[in-house]
């Protein structure tokens, strides 16, 4: 499916080498101040063009087609489009019938019987432009509640920061070319990425996301738990292979006496849960870690088959990220924002008082 969300519905469209990519956000309340500069800044953060990302240079200028009037949302669908200006489709001519390892080529072809071989079509990281645009719009709603979502890179390849989560430096990450959260490891991260690129290879990365200013009560019970929604959103991002919330995998190694978040004087004394209990936010910071596999597009010689079953050796052309997780940190923030904005809107009907308040009734 290409649509995500319950009350705030986000739909993305477009392919890597098509005319454009974009999104439609339906369900945004009227009267939210629309910050077009912020939208463009978020898209600019996701852009490639540096030696640590894809060399593909796109202006990524957002055009808002609907849903905004005189600087405010109208309550109607918000359509945003970003035109592709720098696709080199000829680089993919030799891949028309070939299945690239670790890509969606094989599965797309056998599911649909047709696939866009130019840059991977819908399975390309280019689709994340739409996610970042949608996440930026969601952030405009979250601002009204002083909810702030921040992400950065805490691991590249075998280099992983040993800083405590509260020590991660988001101010440094804002200035870092690779959104690095640990100033002492930035050079190691960069070297790891460049070494992978220079050896015609790629490398994975780990992204940390913190949400501050959280309210109590976001999320539903059982099948629409906040942690379920967040995992769903993040696992839908290209190249993501794992998501942790709070202690995550660590919790399986702990005892309850250590993992439980005790309360005293109306406050939690720790946050092993990552801000979620019973699928509902408890007001503490949301803590998430997202793990990206190495970019599957590498320039080393590889083996595969074509759609006729022939064995082949090939070398890729084109322009690809040596570490997709770097720009993935921007996408992670976007998806978390979409989830939280959706949950905020769902809460208006969570109980009778909320529903009456929506109509100004007591």
From Swiss-Prot:
Pathway: Metabolic intermediate biosynthesis; chorismate biosynthesis; chorismate from D-erythrose 4-phosphate and phosphoenolpyruvate: step 7/7
UniProt key word Flavoprotein: yes
UniProt GO molecular function: chorismate synthase activity; FMN binding
CDD domains (alphabetical): Chorismate_synthase
EC number: 4.2.3.5
First-tier enzyme category under EC: lyase
Catalytic activity: 5-O-(1-carboxyvinyl)-3-phosphoshikimate = chorismate + phosphate
Cofactor binding, note field: Reduced FMN (FMNH(2)).
InterPro entries: Chorismate_synth, Chorismate_synth_AroC_sf, Chorismate_synthase_CS
A GO CC term assigned to this protein in UniProt: cytosol
GO biological process, one term: aromatic amino acid family biosynthetic process
Keywords, ordered alphabetically: Amino-acid biosynthesis, Aromatic amino acid biosynthesis, FAD, Flavoprotein, FMN, Lyase, NADP
Cofactor: FMNH2
Residues annotated for FMN binding in this entry: 122-124, 238-239, 278, 293-297, 319
Record: residues binding NADP(+): 46
Short name of any one Pfam family annotated for the protein: Chorismate_synt
Function according to Swiss-Prot or TrEMBL: This reaction introduces a second double bond into the aromatic ring system.
Subunit and interaction comment: Homotetramer.
Protein name in UniProt: Chorismate synthase
């Amino acid at each position: 499916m290409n649509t995500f969300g319950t009350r705030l519905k986000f739909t993305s469209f477009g392919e890597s080498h098509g005319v454009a990519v974009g999104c439609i956000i339906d369900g945004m309340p009227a009267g939210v101040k629309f910050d077009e500069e912020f939208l463009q800044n978020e898209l600019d953060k996701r852009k490639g063009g540096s030696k640590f990302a894809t060399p593909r240079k796109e202006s990524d200028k957002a055009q808002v087609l609907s849903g905004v009037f005189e600087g405010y949302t109208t309550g109607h669908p918000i359509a945003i489009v970003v035109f592709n200006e720098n696709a080199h489709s000829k680089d993919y001519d030799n891949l028309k019938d070939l299945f690239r390892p670790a890509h969606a080529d094989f599965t797309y072809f056998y599911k649909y019987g047709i696939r866009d071989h130019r840059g991977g079509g819908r399975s390309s990281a280019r689709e994340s432009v739409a996610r970042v645009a949608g996440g930026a719009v969601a952030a405009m709603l979250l601002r009204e509640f002083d909810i702030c979502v921040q992400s950065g890179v805490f691991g590249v390849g075998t280099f992983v920061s040993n800083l405590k989560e509260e020590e991660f430096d988001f101010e440094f990450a804002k200035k870092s070319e690779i959104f690095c959260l640990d100033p002492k490891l930035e050079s190691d991260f960069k070297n790891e990425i460049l070494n992978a690129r220079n050896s015609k290879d790629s490398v994975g990365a780990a992204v940390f996301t913190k949400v501050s200013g959280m309210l109590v009560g976001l999320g539903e019970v059982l099948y629409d738990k906040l942690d379920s929604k967040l995992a769903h959103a993040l696992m839908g991002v290209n190249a993501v292979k794992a998501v942790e919330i709070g202690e995550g995998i660590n919790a399986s190694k702990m005892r309850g006496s250590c993992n439980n978040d005790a309360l005293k004087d109306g406050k939690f004394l720790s946050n092993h849960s990552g801000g979620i209990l019973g699928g509902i936010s408890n007001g503490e910071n949301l803590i998430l870690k997202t793990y990206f596999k190495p970019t599957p597009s590498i320039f080393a010689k590889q083996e595969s088959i074509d759609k006729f079953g022939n064995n082949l050796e090939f070398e890729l052309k084109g322009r690809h990220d040596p570490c997709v997780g770097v720009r993935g940190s921007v996408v992670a923030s976007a998806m978390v924002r979409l989830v939280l904005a959706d949950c905020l809107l769902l809460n208006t009907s969570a109980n009778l008082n909320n529903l009456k308040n929506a109509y100004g009734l007591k």
